[in-house]
UniProtKB/Swiss-Prot annotation:
GO CC, one annotated term: ribonucleoprotein complex
Keywords: Ribonucleoprotein, Ribosomal protein, RNA-binding, rRNA-binding
Biological process (GO), any one: translation
GO terms assigned for molecular function: rRNA binding; structural constituent of ribosome
Protein's name according to its UniProt entry: Small ribosomal subunit protein uS11
Disulfide bonds: none
Family affiliation: Belongs to the universal ribosomal protein uS11 family.
Amino acid sequence: MAQAPTRTRKKVKKTVSDGIAHIYATFNNTIVTITDRQGNTLSWATSGGSGFRGSRKSTPFAAQVAAERAGTAAQEYGLKNLEVLVRGPGPGRESAVRALNNAGFKILNISDITPIPHNGCRPPKKRRV
């Protein structure tokens, strides 16, 4: 018996008007993730994934390129407004926020959510160069 042709449905892209940009800036890399209000990931990009390797990964320019790539991918969902959450002490913090602003997003507020220990784990020893 011949099988009936299965119809493939075209996946409908959801439209989101406002979302959250999570910027995780470490000393070695910068990760930019753009989510909707519920926390579902719409797009993401990293400095390392944007073509920067080694010490160039931890530069503000690499963070700017990563934020631009995540922003252009998120604009396909119709994203207009962003709430920015910045975490970590890295050099790409401000440049990533500036790149999202220049990409055409209206930034509603910027929050620093860097975890600060209440005297928890012992920190790494100081570098001697």
